[in-house]
């Protein structure tokens, strides 16, 4: 009897301990949850209202655009501050500071790419309207950080640090990281170069690159249907842009309303405005252009002194020294030599390669998202895109006045007479870019006779161009399937277009 009482007492203690542990875990995870009701004191010029719908999407209504973007920064930080901080750390090469030596290689590569330096430089080159928008967003993020010290999400507690203030340059870092993800082709260039050096050149060019096995290939889709094919007689647009898979998503659903703007859709995390979505007059979506924006150059360089050859002369590379902090250890110093083509990024088998990247070019890195958000028609849409200088995208457009359109835009290198899909000879100086491709020389279509537009990462360069075309374009099977489905019938509704987005048939 005594033993059974002891066992019962032990069981009760175990249950109590388990309940207490679960309660502690629940409190630990959910204690920093966003405040979604009540009033908050903030530095805005007039009251701002933030409501959330049944899907928890924030709807912001403000008296000024600055106040609206301040609120966007605040609600984004409420839900995604850890993600934002990781994004800027990955891009800026600062993961080792919180994760230790395991992240050192990632940080070293990011420092070689100079993402942090590029972001700082570009922050000073922004047009006043774009800088003001990014500053308002950053103020909102920082208001959340400042009013929640020691009450941030559990990830910060586990890692044992507090987030530093958000800067304009951090929003640019987030965009640069997306650019890096979408345009990193240097490994492919190296692989193809190795095959060409050891195999049949004609066969390599025919077959490379090859995707082996049944692995899914990531790809984005966007399409527009003119009114002649819809039940309403008005255009319809659908889009599902894909970035790297992750939880949470790199997209943040939001609705922003202020004088001169009423826009809803998905913001790219860490950036103000709506990247893809619609306002009262137009709708738009994007897919990756897949144009090659990186080139590797072979270099004859002394990696001890930084002296290298170019066009028969010996030049001095610029030393870039970075101090990388490592959690629990002394930091390390990383030295990168910067040639006229870019940083020495990789070396193998005694050969050093420099990396030239369109995102690192000195021209302003324009992010005219608010211009897109406020555009009322095709001309204003294209005018906003003409100053866009981020990663290459296919932009699909539809408007309430009955138009559909396509526009390519982004920072694309102007190569004349060479493609750049294998490492180029650096010392000879014969394979140099001549700037970036002008906006008016990029593919553009308004109201095609078919009444259909579809972009699925396929090659959009259907006409001769003065610059070489090179890229990791998708095979045309997805775009062909979309066009075949759209052309198979008429009187489409928005709900019915969803069946095309969910279609899984492969025409390969």
Task: Label every model-predicted segment.
Residues 1-19:
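N-terminal Sec-pathway targeting helices
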Residues 11, 24-248, 260, 265-269, ...:
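Substrate-recognition/specificity elements adjacent to catalytic centers across diverse enzyme folds
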Residues 351, 390-489:
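Hydrophobic alpha-helical segments
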Residues 182, 186, 347-367, 372:
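Conserved, charged catalytic cores of large soluble enzymes
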Residues 359-362, 366-395, 400-401, 468-508:
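Proteins synthesized as precursors that undergo proteolytic processing into mature forms
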Residues 214-216, 252-265, 271, 361-367, ...:
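A conserved hydrophobic secondary-structure block that centers on an alpha-helix together
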Residues 61, 68-70, 233-234, 245-249, ...:
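Short helix/loop capping segments that flank catalytic or ligand/cofactor-binding pockets
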Residues 200, 262-263, 268-331, 370-374:
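Compact, glycine/acidic-enriched structural inserts
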